[in-house]
């Protein structure tokens, strides 16, 4: 990766400087005094302990006691040392195994957590600096925590697959469940939000469907949908449920969605005529609007999967024009993917110009599509050797900066695009900047990167240069907010257990794991040497005890 490193440095030099961080407020004399005392406290305690030990050496008869201990150690046989070191090795090995398991499960050291949470307060440990309520540091921490909460919000995957026609077929073939209970529970909550309202009791079919969306068992949901159709043959949400969960092919799903569209349009027109009569009628209109938009969007996705891409693009454009307030559904991401399949790069740029705005939420689809378009202009002629000799051109610098911007937003995507990590079926919900979003993006967009000659090669040479600009991503970002620390936990809930969740930044192994591993290895080695060479190890043990006694007598 030497070429990639050089290109990354060139891009960083060409990039505009980041904004200077704000100046921290000066500490008062009390805070400075407290910090100084905290730094020298440990040294003072150590010196005081040595002085106390020296003063009490005669009353405590340290020399006589040490001589007695030496006689006792000299009387021990080599078998005792073998048993002692073997037991120590076993105990330290068990501690090491437990520490390693706890670190992989919770991402932190158990011994460090217990020390900080329980032992430190007992020993009188305090924070080096305490923020007063309303202080600038406290305000910054509150702002950061609020940003982390918004960044860790779970979003519905705009390109989510069909349960019956895709997820279930995967289960039939592999025997693995691609969706987690947490993910499906979020979908159930979405369905209740989109497809129900307070006036459902007025229509028996809607009452049945309200129970169906809350049902956990798929066969029970399908049975309830058929019951709703028996009560009302124009129940659009019943057709939606059957298309999502019972249809085993995209063709069957499209047929059911077309029936849902016919029923949904009729109900929507009826709700439009009555919307001003009461607040209940307005709630019905919002619900019927959600149902209609959902049906049309899924029909567009069916057309995209069946190869009728221009038809899918038309449906999506009409949806975005007819229902502009529903931008939170991220229909533009469906449109971007379809336009990339058509290789209509000018239209893709036009969509990005509207949605890649500083005031709008970002996504991996937005950032990486922008990087792909800039990469497309230089990737076919790009050569690392040539760029190292003559430097990067303006277009190449723009492409590298776009890649760095995308990687900073979601650092998990490149490994999937470069096929360094295997893909799985994307979940129904994603966490922005997390591994789940990276899987969802790469699952649909990998083919678009492969289609452009040299795009993946340029990505491979430059993407790791991003990490030099953000050495501490959890504390400070470059173009975005600091990377949220909650992504790993949320992604583990969203992604199936057979997938190895990508973690960023990579966690360092705690000190106590190294310590217990070294302790286990050293005691095992001592036990082995004592068993094989008892006389030599006995002489070594006596020498160590004599040296220790001499040092104490000297004190």
Curated annotation (Swiss-Prot):
Its main location: membrane. Pfam families: ST7. It is a multi-pass membrane protein. InterPro entries: ST7 (IPR007311). CDD domains: ST7 (cd11557). It is found in: Membrane. One of its GO terms (cellular component) is membrane. The chain crosses the membrane at residues 36-56, 80-100. Residues 126-148 are annotated as: Disordered. Keywords: Membrane, Transmembrane, Transmembrane helix. PANTHER family: SUPPRESSION OF TUMORIGENICITY 7, SUPPRESSOR OF TUMORIGENICITY 7 PROTEIN-LIKE. Belongs to the ST7 family. This is Suppressor of tumorigenicity 7 protein-like.
